Amino acid sequence: MTTNDAGRIPSAAGGAELAALYRLLTWLSPAFPIGGFSYSSGLEWAVEAGDICDAAALRGWLATMLTDGSGFCDAAFLVHAHRATELDDIKRLSEVAELAAAFVPSRERQLETAAQGRAFIEIARSAWSCAGLDEAVAQCDVVVYPVAVGMVGALHGVPLEPLLHGFLHALVSNWISAGSRLVPLGQTDSQRVLAALEPVVVATADRSLHASLDDIGSATFRADLASLRHETQYTRLFRS
């Protein structure tokens, strides 16, 4: 069997769990080439404006993004994309993808999530191909990053909860990586922030598992404004 014929995970319980873990760690690793390192989700402007100046401020900002902003929204869209794909409900998947794209608050954030979603799909198609991927993608005008992860995870038989927790961990880790370069923070402080956000990630995952599409919404005006103002920031390292 070649790499491109990887297909769904084997049915044997132990082998399936290990295969799911292997794929999950690969897809959500910083080494998976979707360009996450080049985006800050508006953090660069928040640092420039003085909203984030140390580890405590970064922790508070990210906790709010998780509970009341894009973290929760993206997690909930991943959940709905995974479930729709599992049920082979293409109409529902298309609706989820359309709504997820519409929720993005700024042009640069749209670029960020659409580009990462597109890259995720392309790499999955090339290295981890499976039946149904092309058909599912064809039904969606835009596949943003969380929808892409939910879709591919379901098609490969990766269970929803570990996929969701892995996604949120990867999301937070990327934010912290950006913050550590911008504030800047040392490696130990960065890990302290990641450790402090563990219960917030768990709570966000649990909430998103039970959220309907009507429950999805954000209340992070300052973070959304940062992503808008970053578009005209004079000196910057990141694309968002």
UniProtKB/Swiss-Prot annotation:
GO terms for cellular component: cytoplasm. It is found in: Cytoplasm. Coiled coil: none annotated. Signal peptide: none annotated. Keywords: Chaperone, Cytoplasm, Nickel insertion. One of its GO terms (molecular function) is nickel cation binding. InterPro entries: UreF, UreF_sf. UreD, UreF and UreG form a complex that acts as a GTP-hydrolysis-dependent molecular chaperone, activating the urease apoprotein by helping to assemble the nickel containing metallocenter of UreC. The UreE protein probably delivers the nickel. Required for maturation of urease via the functional incorporation of the urease nickel metallocenter. Belongs to the UreF family. This is Urease accessory protein UreF. The gene is ureF.
